[in-house]
Structure formats: C-alpha cells, structure tokens
C-alpha cells in the first residue's frame, strides 16, 4: 500500500543531509546506507548509493527513471540457487508410478 500523499515521501534525514552535502560540493562519492525504505528523490540522481541487503552493500547508481521508487527495490535480498533435483546422466527423473 503506497504512502499517503499528505504525509509526503520518507527519506532518512541522515541520507538526505549526506546527498545535499555532496551536491553542494559537486562530488560523486559512494554513500553507504541501511535505509532500504527511503524513497529516491530527484536530488539523488547521478549518485551511487550502497544499499545494504542484509549481508553486504550493493552499489546502486541512481538514474532519472528510479525517482519515486524505494532504495530496497534495487538491492535484492534473496539469492535463487535453483530447485533441488536429481542429477542423473540421462537428464531425466525417476519413472512415474501409475
């Protein structure tokens, strides 16, 4: 469920201050954050933000079409390793019962 428009977007204040400081100095450093729920604002465009996925920080380069989304959408937390299955040389599975 999206956030109410009268409340406005949630952006962690510390993250917002860091990006504002980088914008005033015209610097492009990687900013680490654990705030996956922060909304991407137009001021973030062009910066690389390292978003924590529970194990490590994933660098996310912010482009214009990411504005309005949350940072956590671009740092997946789960790794898919495939379904378990029998590895036979023929490539087939066990014969089915009728």
Curated annotation (Swiss-Prot):
Keywords: Ribonucleoprotein, Ribosomal protein, RNA-binding, rRNA-binding. PANTHER family: RIBOSOMAL PROTEIN S19P FAMILY MEMBER, SMALL RIBOSOMAL SUBUNIT PROTEIN US19M. This is Small ribosomal subunit protein uS19. GO terms for molecular function: rRNA binding; structural constituent of ribosome. PROSITE patterns: RIBOSOMAL_S19. Belongs to the universal ribosomal protein uS19 family. GO terms for biological process: ribosomal small subunit assembly; translation. GO terms for cellular component: cytoplasm; small ribosomal subunit. It holds the Pfam family Ribosomal_S19. Protein S19 forms a complex with S13 that binds strongly to the 16S ribosomal RNA. InterPro entries: Ribosomal_uS19, Ribosomal_uS19_bac-type, Ribosomal_uS19_CS, Ribosomal_uS19_SF. Residues 77-98 are annotated as: Disordered.
């Amino acid at each position: 469920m999206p956030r109410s428009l009268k409340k406005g977007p949630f952006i962690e204040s510390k993250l917002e201050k860091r990006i504002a400081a980088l914008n005033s100095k015209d610097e492009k450093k990687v900013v680490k954050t654990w705030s996956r729920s922060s909304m991407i604002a137009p001021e973030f465009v062009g910066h690389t933000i390292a978003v924590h996925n529970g194990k490590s920080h994933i660098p996310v380069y912010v482009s214009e079409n990411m504005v309005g989304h949350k940072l956590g959408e671009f740092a997946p937390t789960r790794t898919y390793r495939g379904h378990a299955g029998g590895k036979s040389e023929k490539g087939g599975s066990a014969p089915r019962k009728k």
